[in-house]
Amino acid sequence: MLNAGNPIGVMDSGIGGLTVVRELQRILPGEDIIYFGDSANCPYGNKTSDQIFDLSCNMLRFLGDNGVKCTAIACNTISTLSDRLRPCFDYQIISIVEEAAKYVVREHLTSVGLIATEFTVASGKYA
């Protein structure tokens, strides 16, 4: 277990991140999880970088205020801003983009399919 007293945060722009929650519950059954899916403002893919940043900061503040030890960003679009978000918070923020890229390299994959918003594709983070 990571840190028994504090929950893990998972955030997404909608409900897709519930698949991440389900997998975390499977591999870390003793961990508490707080999920924040911002379905009120989705989709994020047609928003500006600053709009996505502000909405993401609101979610991360909420999760931090609720004592998470780390947060997994379960949204490709938000993950493209993880380098900009991390300095604003004093707990670990894990990007699905970075973790997916590590997996592709580790497994020596040469072809990968991706469902992404225009914002995510334009960011070049998966290039």
Each PLM stretch: what is its role?
Residues M1-A127:
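Non-catalytic structural scaffold of enzyme domains
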